[in-house]
Swiss-Prot record:
Its EC number is 3.1.3.-, 5.2.1.8. Mg(2+) binds at D22, D24, D221. Keywords: Hydrolase, Isomerase, Magnesium, Metal-binding, Rotamase. GO terms for molecular function: metal ion binding; peptidyl-prolyl cis-trans isomerase activity; phosphatase activity. This is Putative bifunctional phosphatase/peptidyl-prolyl cis-trans isomerase. Residues 286-468 form the PPIase cyclophilin-type domain. It comes from Streptococcus pyogenes serotype M6 (strain ATCC BAA-946 / MGAS10394).
Length: 470
């Protein structure tokens, strides 16, 4: 599960000038090839803000899926940092494995009965072909040829093991001086030049551009991202990622299939959220509905469990058990709101289904517009059973003033046209909205009753029951 993002990390994000993405199980799901549609939006949005985008992968260029190539990253760090190009295919850095080291590795592999592969600039090859090798490599590089003497004619930038020895496999001392193993599959490890890593490749881009590590944000999921997570200013692990990588991550986001990259970048403020405002589109909202039946008429509301799940569950739970039956609206202020939900009728009582007060659930997509159903509270995170419905029909602010204050344009327009209580936004949890004209008429009727001390109606306005339509 993804964690919450703290303010300190959001502040660090203000320094980000470039974002690097791993490919497998980061941009796309390796086993299925699925890449979320949101990835295209991510690349376009970052570029539109002047933030550079890069790929940092263990794959070579010829192993990069077409849909990833079509994203046109500004820079590509390939083969775990051994080969770096920009989008114009200018070579920024390259570090082939010395020929004698390749020969020594092949001899050791043959002596150990280990199959291997070699990756050059333009193609990769295998020492042999069997089911174990195919199971490991075909999702990354399909239909590789068998060519064990490839290194005699081409530079080699990376190699692989294919074996069933797992993490216990170790290089002999003479090879470990030059090479290291990075496990990426149950039956395979990358064999890379010692000192070479994605972090090295990214650092070459950073130096080339005159940037600093603090300007770099990286996404990854596997062990070959460890050095990069140490290097970058901000590191984000995918929801499904290696536990050791998660320990180093500044933030663990959602899964690939849950638009984890988009989610993290929106939370960091590097991409503007594409907000939806269900209160302005009730016809297309499918949440549960309730009817508050009172001695002055009925009010029907739709609820928003996706935005305020705990609050909606509390309200529905109390309604279904009859908790609100017979309770009055104990506080009514015309051109403001009507408040109820306290069994003592004093504004001092009430209890949630959780047995204690619970936390606020603020959303960038819900506001205290006229007709909004919100939680009453005694301060932050003190929600119980009390609620109010916003009745105000006019506010002293124009649309442009609200926009300057940070309210989204559609919400600012709704406030200016229909009224509401914008000063309560992010102070009270909005979790529902009146749905029809009849309900608004009843709301206004209740708001117009005569009140006395502490805004309490002189004649009780009673909630007879709340009917729930899940």
């Amino acid at each position: 599960m993804e964690e919450s993002m703290d303010a300190k990390l959001k502040y660090k994000a203000k320094k980000i000038k470039m974002v690097f993405f791993d490919i497998d199980d980061t941009l796309r799901v390796k086993d299925t090839g699925y890449m979320p549609e949101s990835i295209q939006r991510v690349f376009k949005a970052l570029k539109a803000k002047g933030i550079l985008v890069g790929i940092a992968s263990g794959r070579a260029r010829y192993g990069v899926p077409q849909e990833v190539q079509d994203l046109h990253a500004d820079y590509c760090v390939k083969l775990n940092g051994a080969y770096v190009k920009d989008d114009a295919k200018t070579i920024i850095f390259q570090a082939p494995i010395p020929a004698d080291v390749v020969v020594a590795y092949k001899k050791w592999a043959d002596d150990m009965g280990i199959f291997y592969g070699m990756a050059g600039r333009h193609e990769a090859v295998l020492s042999a072909r069997n089911d174990m090798i195919s199971n490991a490599i075909d999702n990354v590089y399909a239909q590789l040829e068998v060519c064990p003497d490839y290194n005699e004619y081409h530079d080699v930038y990376q190699m692989w093991t294919f074996e069933d020895k797992g993490d216990g496999l170790q290089l002999p001392a003479e090879l470990a001086e030059h090479l290291r193993l990075v496990r990426w599959h149950d039956n395979s490890s990358d064999v890379v030049l010692k000192g070479t890593s994605k972090a090295l490749g990214v650092s070459k881009v950073v130096d080339h551009l005159g940037l600093k590590p603090e300007n770099i944000l990286v996404f990854g999921d596997e062990l070959n991202d460890l050095e990069l997570f140490d290097y970058a200013g901000i590191s984000i692990a995918m929801g499904v990622s290696h536990p050791l990588l998660q320990e180093k991550a500044d933030f663990i986001t959602k899964k690939v299939e849950e638009d984890g990259i988009l989610y993290a970048l929106e939370e960091l403020g590097l991409i503007d959220k594409e907000l939806q405002f269900p209160q302005l589109d009730l016809e297309n909202h499918t949440g549960p509905k309730v009817t508050i039946k009172t001695n002055h008429g009925d009010m029907t509301l739709v609820l928003f469990p996706d935005h305020a799940p705990k609050t909606v569950a509390n309200f529905l739970g109390l309604a279904k058990e009859g908790y609100y039956d017979g309770i009055i609206f104990h506080r009514i202020i015309p051109e403001f709101m009507i408040q109820g939900g306290d069994p003592t009728g004093t504004g001092m009582g009430g209890q949630s289904i959780y047995g204690e007060s619970f936390e606020d659930e603020f959303s960038d997509e819900l506001y205290n517009l006229r007709g909004a159903l919100s939680m009453a509270n005694a301060g932050p995170n003190t929600n119980g059973s009390q609620f109010f419905i916003v009745q105000n029909s006019k506010i002293p602010y124009a649309k442009k003033e609200l926009e300057r204050g940070g309210w989204p344009t559609p919400i600012a327009a709704a406030y200016a046209e229909n009224g509401g209580t914008p000063h309560l936004d992010r102070r009270h949890t909005v979790f529902g909205q009146l749905v029809d004209e009849t309900s608004f008429q009843v709301l206004d009727l209740i708001a117009g009753v005569e009140t006395g001390a502490q805004d309490k109606p002189k004649e009780d306005v009673i909630i007879e029951t709340i009917e729930v339509f899940d």
